[in-house]
Amino acid sequence: MIMEALVALLRFPFYSFGKQSYQVRQSLLLPSPSALKGALAKGIILLGGKKGKSLDEIAKKTVEELENKLIYVGAKPYKSSIIKTPILLKRLRNLEDQKNPEKSDAMRREYVFAREILAIYVFRRKLSEEEKDLMLKAVYLIDQLGDTECVGNVIKTEWVEVKEEKAPLKTYVKFKKVSKMSINGGIIENMLETPNFGNKVKEEPYLLPLIEKRYRRSSYYVESDRIFDGNYKIIAFDEVIGLWI
């Protein structure tokens, strides 16, 4: 089976992928599969050619078609550590068409600082040149992941070959796939696998090949080579990246 991966180098000043909670929202360390799929699907829609009765219908159909082509979606930090910090957000509602608009609400939310990350899209089969060109153009249209707070831009992107060779795991994997393996560290986080479009979608636990370190009172997260080896690998932007597919 010949597989290829589209790898995009994304740059953010900061981002926040909120966990399911109320008022105090912690952030995931890395963008979830649902955020990555949704961002690529948005790019495909912007390029046109999709029809439907509503934008939600078009988006849902586009995501379904995309998921049929993908076998893996993930992300990793690119030559940088990950740092969390709490920021108080005050969301104003100045545009409400009411004589007595509701008071603005405030909530505490974590933001993550990781200068650059790699978004990895692995396709089940080798795509045609036309399909590859469409995906490439769609990736370059990514300007945010998930919420509007996660504004970023694509620096560069490339297609790479997926090789069935062992290499240290560098990007997250569903925990149930590797739960019986000998795992040396890592961090477990619950993430959405697919955009929910208003429906209740259960979060899945994922293993992130990161370790926590401390400097004085602050915590930061770095990659680890000792979690375990992935069963596939790619080489992208001068990095050898182990995957578990």
From Swiss-Prot:
CDD domains attached to this UniProt entry: Cas5_I-A
InterPro entries to which the protein is assigned, alphabetical: CRISPR-assoc_prot_Cas5, CRISPR-assoc_prot_Cas5_N, CRISPR-assoc_prot_Cas5a-typ, CRISPR_Cas5_sf
BP GO terms, sorted: defense response to virus; maintenance of CRISPR repeat elements
Keywords recorded for this protein, A-Z: Antiviral defense
Pfam families referenced in this protein's UniProt entry, alphabetically: Cas_Cas5d (PF09704)
Domain of life of the organism encoding this protein: Archaea
Protein family: Belongs to the CRISPR-associated protein Cas5 family. Subtype I-A/Apern subfamily.
Function: CRISPR (clustered regularly interspaced short palindromic repeat) is an adaptive immune system that provides protection against mobile genetic elements (viruses, transposable elements and conjugative plasmids). CRISPR clusters contain spacers, sequences complementary to antecedent mobile elements, and target invading nucleic acids. CRISPR clusters are transcribed and processed into CRISPR RNA (crRNA).
Protein name in UniProt: CRISPR-associated protein Cas5
Species annotation: Methanocaldococcus jannaschii (strain ATCC 43067 / DSM 2661 / JAL-1 / JCM 10045 / NBRC 100440) (Methanococcus jannaschii)
